[in-house]
């Protein structure tokens, strides 16, 4: 992880336990971490708290991330949309439900654009 941080790399991690997530985010503040599944594997409220505490943490919304209507809107209302990334869990789960979650939640076009591509561009350093 030190090597990834020193080269300004992004580390995409499948969720494990909440204590492990907190520990890694705290111990590696300069490391860009992307966790899969916003509300799955450990609990939505814990993930919101991680986003609130650690600016180096991003979540993708794949598969278990938005399987409950209102999860995405509630997340944005609590911590903003700037560290939420569109993702799919393909081939485990097809992308249709993840796309629908963003399209059918009550989001602004700015929020949708950021989640679908703007946040990833910024994280990856890709200019528009």
Protein language model annotation of sequence segments:
Residues 4, 37, 59, 89, ...:
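Conserved, mostly hydrophobic/aromatic
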Residues 1-85:
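Catalytic pocket-lining loop regions of alpha/beta-barrel enzymes
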Residues 81-83, 96-128:
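Mid-to-C-terminal alpha-helical segments outside catalytic/metal-binding sites
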């Amino acid at each position: 992880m030190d090597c990834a941080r020193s080269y300004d790399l992004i580390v995409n991690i499948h969720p494990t336990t909440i204590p492990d997530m907190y520990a890694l985010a705290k111990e590696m503040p300069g490391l860009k971490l992307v966790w899969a599944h916003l509300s799955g594997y450990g609990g939505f409220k814990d993930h919101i708290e991680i986003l609130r505490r650690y600016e180096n943490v991003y979540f993708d919304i794949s598969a278990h991330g938005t399987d409950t209507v209102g999860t995405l809107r509630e997340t944005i209302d609590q911590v903003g949309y700037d560290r939420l990334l569109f993702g799919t869990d393909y081939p485990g789960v097809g992308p249709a439900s993840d796309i629908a979650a963003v399209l059918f939640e009550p989001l602004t076009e700015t929020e949708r654009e950021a989640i679908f591509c703007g946040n990833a561009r910024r994280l990856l350093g890709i200019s528009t």
